[in-house]
Swiss-Prot record:
FAD binds at residues 13-18, 125, 180, 370. The lineage of its organism: Bacteria, Pseudomonadati, Pseudomonadota, Gammaproteobacteria, Enterobacterales. Belongs to the MnmG family. GO terms for biological process: tRNA methylation; tRNA wobble uridine modification. Homodimer. Heterotetramer of two MnmE and two MnmG subunits. One of its GO terms (molecular function) is flavin adenine dinucleotide binding. Gene3D superfamilies: FAD/NAD(P)-binding domain, GidA associated domain, C-terminal subdomain, tRNA uridine 5-carboxymethylaminomethyl modification enzyme MnmG/GidA. NCBIfam families: mnmG_gidA (TIGR00136). This is tRNA uridine 5-carboxymethylaminomethyl modification enzyme MnmG. It is found in: Cytoplasm. Its cofactor is FAD.
Length: 629
């Protein structure tokens, strides 16, 4: 039977991509349905209990700037907050929080259940309704059919998921959850390129069986960082330390002597694993010269005794896992409460997607998260938000939106996936962004919140706070520009006490702040430049904008030159065999990728600058040279 009410957007899957997609579509006023196999696991952290990190924290801040959920949820659930790369420049600083799994899941579910325009329904999806190469609905395992104008697939590792522990394996979406086999078969019938990837997770340890007294502690930062631009540290629950142990030669001997029982090394697993989150077997073999690896013992929550040993992801048999765990300091008597495992799953080639994450072949069908070949909660959440907002726009007959590489890490992520594809689980790093000085965590709202407001993602409260912050920044910069001190002034001695070289000429507050030894905090304790802003976010922006003004201006010039290519559009139906002068290799690659713009075409491996020049001349001759706004 058909469900009596039609929907604008259907989201299939309630993980980090699905929850952001559902919230985005509903915030934009579209009637949204979230279908999940289990309402109790909405927002579940399937692997490590943490949010953020290098590159990943940037994505979380961008999701937040666009009105998303993840940052707000972790502010309510984070039990240890730290700034990584704190001693480095602002471009690569990143926030990371250890999470209480239960509190995080509760925060996500509460937000979903109180979101207008959103209905949640518990049923696994087994089929899509496709008519004339357009998706028009979904079918659940009990045969119930739902109609919609757009469907977003956010199914994580569930598509034909296979769990491996040693040489034994069984079907599963993750430990304790069934796989989605009928939906996997249905998607394989569609004109989509499919592959297999693999990821893994470590065994979980009973904290009561660990001797923490012999281990080094790692505490969070004080003052505590905050993830959401709307958040504050008072929202954080109780904070707790993590602990550090190490593998050793005994650990490595156990692993090396049991490699024949590893499904990866025995050839049982076909899928490629994540390069930047390797299993302990991989680490021992790839870095044979190292006699130890650092392992972080991370609490899974305030009310749980489970410990997540970050760094020993493994699919070795359970008896070997026990030996590995007990070979490490402080863990000699440790007990495992959940075994580690590897999971293989289907993913679909993201080169078959538009930058909006809509399929090039099935109209109205969007893909987000691990199904696109990424790894990580943050990468999934960012894609989910983008797919959800574009599904909402499509259902409202509006043009799609995707950020440029110069606008957001989300733009880098989507461009990398849709242009280059991936042969291994893709993880975000700051090094992937060529304009990272512009794409900092601290200015994600300045880059994206105004766009989010135009798209209908940003509510009145966030918009008011954003405008207040802008006014505070502008007012403070004007104050510092117009406040001067001269070498002969009474205040000069007070100022000189904080400078490596005394004043030799008149200087404004901004001139002083540009000096490497001066900080905004220090400057605003000096009589001529007091008091400091009480708005800490605005104060941070003032300091960064002043200190890095020259570098930022230079990077902005580079971006403007590059935008000319980014905005030169290529027709989706263009057959590149028509373009005389292109090599057969270039023709094949362009016809295979179908790039959306000259900028995207230029990043395809093998497409040379000469080929781009030929293409531009041909487009001009044909009267097809057009640029987007």
């Amino acid at each position: 039977m058909f469900y009596p009410d039609p929907f604008d957007v259907i989201i299939i899957g309630g993980g980090h991509a699905g929850t952001e997609a559902a919230m985005a579509a509903a915030r934009m006023g579209q009637q949204t349905l979230l279908l999940t196999h289990n309402i109790d696991t909405l927002g579940q952290m399937s692997c490590n209990p943490a949010i953020g990190g290098i590159g990943k924290g940037h994505l979380v801040k961008e999701v937040d700037a666009l009105g998303g959920l993840m940052a707000k949820a972790i502010d309510q659930a984070g039990i240890q907050f730290r700034i990584l790369n704190a001693s480095k420049g602002p471009a690569v600083r990143a926030t990371r929080a250890q999470a209480d799994r239960v509190l995080y899941r509760q925060a996500v579910r509460t937000a979903l259940e109180n979101q207008p325009n959103l209905m949640i329904f518990q049923q696994a999806v087994e089929d899509l309704i496709v008519e004339n190469d357009r998706v028009v609905g979904a079918v659940t395992q009990m045969g119930l059919k739902f109609r919609a104008k757009a469907v977003v697939l956010t199914v994580g590792t569930f598509l034909d998921g296979k769990i491996h522990i040693g040489l034994d394996n069984y079907s599963g979406g993750r430990a304790g959850d069934p796989p989605s086999i009928p939906l996997s078969r249905r998607l394989r019938e569609l004109p989509l390129r499919v592959g297999r990837l693999k990821t893994g997770t470590p065994p979980r340890i009973d904290a009561r069986t660990i001797d923490f007294s012999v281990l080094a502690q790692q505490h969070g930062d004080n003052p505590m960082p905050v993830f959401s631009f709307m958040g504050n540290a008072s929202q954080h629950p109780q904070q707790v330390p993590c602990y550090i142990t190490h593998t050793n030669e005994k650990t490595h001997d156990v692993i090396r002597s049991n490699l024949d029982r590893s499904p990866m090394y025995a050839g049982v697993i076909e899928g490629v694993g994540p390069r930047y989150c390797p299993s302990i077997e991989d680490k021992v073999m790839r870095f044979a010269e190292r006699n130890q690896h650092q392992i972080f013992l991370e609490p899974e929550g305030l009310t749980s005794n489970e410990i997540y040993p970050n760094g020993i992801s493994t699919s070795l048999p359970f008896d070997v896992q026990m030996q590995i765990v007990r070979s490490m300091q402080g863990m000699e008597n440790a007990k495992i409460v959940r075994p580690g495992y590897a999971i293989e799953y289907d993913f679909f080639d993201p080169r078959d997607l538009k930058p909006t994450l809509e399929s090039k072949f099935i109209q109205g069908l969007f893909f987000a998260g691990q199904i696109n070949g990424t790894t990580g909660y943050e990468e999934a959440a960012a894609q989910g938000l983008l797919a959800g907002l574009n599904a909402a726009r499509l259902s409202a007959d509006k043009e799609g939106w995707a950020p440029a590489r110069s606008q957001a890490y989300l733009g880098v992520l989507v461009d990398d996936l849709c242009t280059l594809g991936t042969k291994e689980p893709y993880r975000m790093f700051t090094s992937r962004a060529e304009y990272r000085l512009m794409l900092r965590e601290d200015n994600a709202d300045l880059r994206l919140t105004e766009i989010g407001r135009e798209l209908g993602l940003v509510d009145d409260e966030r918009w008011a706070r954003f405008n207040e912050k802008l006014e505070n920044i502008e007012r403070e910069r004007q104050r510092l520009k117009s406040t001067w001190v001269t070498p002969s002034a009474e205040a000069a001695a007070e100022v000189n006490a904080h400078l490596t070289a005394p004043l030799s000429r008149e200087a404004s507050g901004e001139d002083l702040l540009r000096r490497p030894e001066m900080t905004y905090e220090k400057l605003t304790t000096l009589t001529p430049f007091a008091p400091a802003l009480t708005d800490e976010q605005a104060a941070e922006q003032v300091e960064i904008q002043v200190k890095y003004e020259g570098y930022i201006a230079r990077q902005q010039d580079e971006i403007e030159k590059q935008l000319r290519n980014e905005n030169t559009l290529l027709p989706a139906t263009l057959d590149y065999r028509q373009v005389s002068g292109l090599s057969n290799e270039v023709i094949a690659k362009l016809n295979d990728h179908k790039p959306a713009s000259i900028g995207q075409a230029s990043r395809i491996s093998g497409v040379t600058p000469a080929a781009i020049s030929i293409l531009l001349v041909w487009l001009k001759k044909q009267g097809m040279l057009r640029r987007s706004a």
